[in-house]
Design a protein with these regions (language model features):
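General beta-strand structural signal in soluble alpha/beta enzymes
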Residues: 26-30, 59-61, 81-85, 103-105, ...
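FAD-binding subdomain of flavoenzyme oxidoreductases
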Residues: 127-128, 132-135, 142-255, 484-489
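A conserved active-site cap/scaffold subdomain adjacent to cofactor or substrate pockets
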Residues: 264-265, 273-323
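Conserved glycine-rich FAD pyrophosphate-binding loop
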Residues: 4-5, 54, 79, 86, ...
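Short amphipathic alpha-helix segments
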Residues: 246-279, 363-380, 407-415
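N-terminal flexible segment immediately upstream of the FAD-binding catalytic core
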Residues: 1-72, 88-118, 279-285, 330-351, ...
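Helix N-cap motif at beta-to-alpha junctions
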Residues: 242-245, 298-306, 362-366, 403-408
Length: 489
């Protein structure tokens, strides 16, 4: 099927589906507009390009049978389907380019089972709720378990949403991005056909549907690795001094991230003036950071505090916030919600002229690369680094740098300057899969879509490689390209 959908025909057939399936919860009122959006507006480029996109209806199924009913109806009628978790992602991942039905999986949200180090859940479960249930398995004296990495939006973000549109998050300092071997063990997916089938994909094939915006398969369940749920101490460490302070702050952050004997969950560097933006954005941080300082936000196991404090002293930092695990629980607030994409969210409350970029540094050179780029770009780019392990296990950092936006041309120049210095850019100002993190057409992704979504109804328009599917099939048949092996279904 060509990705040209007649909008009037789609509206009519969607309305017919809504009328024909009264047992499913449908949303057709003004809420559809909100449910058709994500945080695309972080990008001034995407805000112009995607503004006004809207589904024709939202289905909110609660069971697999209801999902199958909606999928079968859409497939029979040729109606596009855009899968949604909680809509906390970026780049318009869950925004429908061609209308149709948004399949909101937030009510399909059960934790199915927990075993030591692994759990299985339905795609719509919120990660905060999943952690609550898995942590409870430790009993009165046991640690229990928790997700290996969560986004800063963990309160509302779903497990399926992280898998379909995310990269990593808090915890990736130990376990790498979600795509690291052992993090995703299996997924159960549904084909988009008039008679939908369900298929279990085990790792590594389970990653064929990862981070492609729900374009090549509908994921119902995920089986993921868990980590011990240590009691986490939260702290902010500040460093004063414009340049010397930054150099010391990044040295401290890197030393803490790399220290194998200090159990940790998160290390975030926010260079000045980002702490000032956060202080202006929320009164909850009042008194937690000194004006003009560089700040490192840290989660370490409470029993690791002496070693952590030793590193602070060695680097001349000042602990300006310290919250015990009990205090974090009692307040129901965490500094996690000022890291990762929440940093950008809070900064935009204060300065709407900001946007951001996403970058990946080179292990072993990451500290020097960050210093060099800060020197070169000055106050035009504000340094925000998240320390993580790579898929291969090396300590590194990812950047979510804030950028003072002036024009699309200058934004592209800034990203190119990073590339010229050996820093990878996952462009957050584009909405097609291959134009962002993927970087190029992946034949395996396209071939998987052909198997799971032969009509091209899933999130149409987002996968550039779909237009090349015939060439990819021909190349595979001629032996010019080797494709991943999928189970028979």
């Amino acid at each position: 099927m060509n990705e040209v959908f007649d909008r009037e025909r789609t509206r009519t057939r969607t309305a017919e589906l809504v009328a024909a399936l009264p047992a499913v919860e449908w949303i057709t009122d003004g809420r559809v507009e909100r449910l058709s959006q994500d945080f695309y507006w972080f990008s001034p480029v995407l805000e112009r390009q995607l503004r006004g996109l809207r589904a024709d209806a939202v289905a909110r199924p609660r069971t697999e049978d209801e999902i199958r009913t909606v999928v079968a109806g859409c497939a029979a009628a040729g109606v596009p389907i855009t899968v949604r978790g909680s809509g906390t992602g970026n780049y318009g991942q869950c925004m429908p380019m061609h209308g149709g039905v948004i399949l909101d999986l937030s009510a399909y949200n059960r934790l199915l089972w927990v075993r030591p180090g692994v759990a299985r859940a339905q795609a719509g479960i919120r990660m905060m709720e999943m952690d609550r249930q898995t942590q409870a398995t430790g009993g009165e004296h046991g640690l229990g378990w928790e997700l290996r990495c969560v986004p800063s939006t963990f309160r509302s973000a779903t497990l399926g949403g992280l898998y379909g549109g995310g990269f990593g998050g808090v915890g990736s300092i130990n376990h790498g991005p979600l795509a690291s071997t052992g993090n995703v063990l299996g997924v159960r997916a549904m084909t988009i056909e008039p008679d939908p089938k369900t298929v279990e994909l085990r790792a590594p094939q389970a990653l064929l549907l990862h981070h492609v915006y729900g374009t090549n398969g509908l994921v119902l369940e995920l089986e993921v690795g868990l980590a011990p749920a240590y009691p986490w101490l939260e702290a902010i460490v500040c460093f004063d001094g414009a340049d010397a302070g930054f150099d010391t702050a990044i040295a401290f952050a890197d030393a803490l991230a790399s220290a194998p004997g200090i159990v940790k969950k998160s290390v975030t560097l926010l260079a000045a003036p980002i702490p000032d933006l956060l202080l202006a954005a929320t009164p909850l941080l009042k008194g937690t950071m000194s004006a003009g300082s560089h700040a490192v936000f840290v989660l370490v196991a409470d029993f690791a505090e002496p070693a952590f404090q030793q590193l602070v002293a060695e680097h001349g930092g000042t602990v300006t916030l310290r919250k015990t695990p009990a205090e974090v629980r009692a307040s129901n607030r965490t500094i996690v919600e000022y890291t990762w994409n929440h940093t950008t969210l809070h900064a935009l409350k204060v300065d709407k002229g900001l946007t951001y970029i996403q970058s990946g540094f080179e292990p072993g050179r990451h500290v020097q690369q960050a210093k060099t780029l800060r020197d070169k770009l000055g106050d035009e780019v504000l340094v925000h680094l998240e320390f993580i392990r790579t898929k291969e296990g090396a300590m590194n950092c990812s950047g979510l740098q804030l950028v003072r936006y002036t024009s699309d041309e200058r934004l592209n120049e800034i990203m190119q300057i990073h590339r010229d210095h050996g820093v990878y850019i996952a462009n957050p100002h584009v909405w097609r899969v291959e134009d962002g993190k993927q970087g190029q057409v992946n034949p395996d992704i396209v071939a998987t879509k052909l198997r799971f979504d032969p009509q091209g109804l899933l999130n149409p328009g987002k996968l550039r490689g779909w237009a090349e599917r015939e060439r990819i099939v021909a190349d595979a048949a001629a032996g010019r390209v080797s494709l991943a092996t999928l189970p028979r279904f």
